[in-house]
Curated annotation (Swiss-Prot):
NCBIfam families per record: PRK00290.1
Gene Ontology MF, one: ATP-dependent protein folding chaperone
Matching SUPFAM superfamilies: Actin-like ATPase domain, Heat shock protein 70kD (HSP70), C-terminal subdomain, Heat shock protein 70kD (HSP70), peptide-binding domain
Composition skew (Polar residues), residue ranges: 620-633
Claim: Nuclease is one of the keywords in the record: no
Protein name: Heat shock 70 kDa protein
InterPro entries to which the protein is assigned, alphabetical: ATPase_NBD (IPR043129), Heat_shock_70_CS (IPR018181), HSP70_C_sf (IPR029048), HSP70_peptide-bd_sf (IPR029047), Hsp_70_fam (IPR013126)
Record region (Disordered): 620-649
Amino acid sequence: MENKIEGVAIGIDLGTTYSCVGVWLHDRVEVIANDQGNRTTPSYVAFTETERLIGDSAKNQVAMNPDNTVFDAKRLIGRRFQDPAVQEDVKPFPFKVICKDGDKPAVEVKYKGETKIFAPEEISSMVLLKMKEIAESFLGKEVKNAVITVPAYFNDSQRQATKDAGAITGLNVLRIINEPTAAAIAYGLDKKTSGSKSERNVLIFDLGGGTFDVSLLTIEEGIFEVKATAGDTHLGGEDFDSRLVNFFVSEFKRKYKKDVTSNARSLRRLRTACERAKRTLSSGTQTTVEIDSLIDGIDYYASITRAKFEELCMDLFRGTSEPVEKVLRDSKISKSEIHDVVLVGGSTRIPKVQQLLIDYFNGKELCKNINPDEAVAYGAAVQAAILAGDTSEKMDLLLLDVSPLSLGLETAGGVMTVLIKRNTTIPTKKTQVFSTYADNQPGVLIQVFEGERSRTKDNNILGKFELTGIPPAPRGVPQIEVTFDIDANGILNVSASDKSTGKSNKITITNDKGRLSKEEIERMVEEAEKYKTEDEKLDKKLEAKNSLENYAYNIRNTVRDEKLKEKIQEEDKKSIEEKVKEVLEFIETNEDLEKEEYEEKEKELKNFANPIISKLYQQGSVPDMGNFSTGQNEQDDNANMGPKIEEVG
């Protein structure tokens, strides 16, 4: 690192369904729990008439507000709207996905009575903001730096879009790293503490909520070298949920002649029940789905066995072996040479997935000594600390990752000429000389593609640019040097120069189809700040409202205290009761006032109650009542805002 990073750096596993954050502290990784006490947080953002919710609170209200609760942004990020996978995904989404700016997906929601449109990067940035806040509340200070993980099989535009999401949140993204590689760090450090030093071939099998990756690494003396990677950015636990949902939808239709899919709220409730059933079936062999008044007042009760669930998903489960075979083939390592098969991602808890893997590796025991939900964030936290300049001996490691897809350009006849083969260690730089196809050709169009097919039309175009001003010459004479340069984030820069004139042009693959422009990112940063300020304002308002309510109840409880029956005059008691009743009615009828108005009301109540409470104090009659303001020895009424209550995590 050329310059040491200011402040602490965190590692964020930005998942399709759940996210997780960790930090290196006191020579170890802390995976941080959120305000609900959970170490993973749903990647959900909800918009209501009054507020924006992120995480558990958003997921908990999804059945009540399906149209405006956004999830699965990771399945949209960096993709084209017309991408068949995106079209397939949006079908069951209860929220609206629209096409914006050419061919980019965006979500449309109602927020505070207005229609708002958000890019997937913005939704992801809100989840990242939540993870950042979880870390800040644990560390007690602001966090600016982060390492964010992506599936190993994410392409260039998906990586770039994830980096943009970090920028919108106001994070300095030190590095984008691959999820299985991050998990391998967690595995490697665990092995290190158990004293293993010899070279190990490790297969990371990472099946999460929405993506699937397999990576094969060799680990020796702190060097983590990725040999090959493969996967499916479109397979995970949600696909298994969908199979259950489809099964119960058809069962319900058969039994009651009603279509659950016609009602977004009913469908959401069914999906939540199916997700719960799937989890239960990982430990039990049978479970029931029970939903009161699912649709048209019909209570739905149905049982499902593990065997039936396995049958419904068997093709998906079996499909997980293909990437495993591919990495073994690409790395030229046989399955008998694999020392450990490491399970990562919540979906690896499914017994059938484990059994198929055991069978594939001829009965080999699977490595389960790292937490599948937390391993990725754990590894990201270690990498963040290293990049921030932490020199702890415990994490003396070097990471050698690879580019997941072949990269090249189009040459005559639509041929894909590969400059960087898949599974090349990154960062890397490759240069090749090309020439013109026609006599006196004044310029060349450089079209950059990624993929494994021999024709560019079957691969994914990343971007294009022109190199013009080539002096007239017969075909094949000009020498055009093209350089592909991949940085440590897996993001590609391409440059071309004419050797005779020295004229050059370059492009950072900003993927005109999927990437946000600098101006768009700046606008989104401003909007993110605005939403954050609104959230904070609402929090302060609720705090003032709760403070007033608590104070009113405490005053009333005090004058009703049996012990004070003899001490307090009946007319004082009556006047306090009336005043408190008036205040509580005021709160009930004024749900949405400004913070200052609630504070003013509390001040008014204190001024009213203080003389009476002071009398009781002077008689020595008042028991210890927490944060009471009596006006005595107090410089400022606002210095004591009534009783505070701690939220229990």
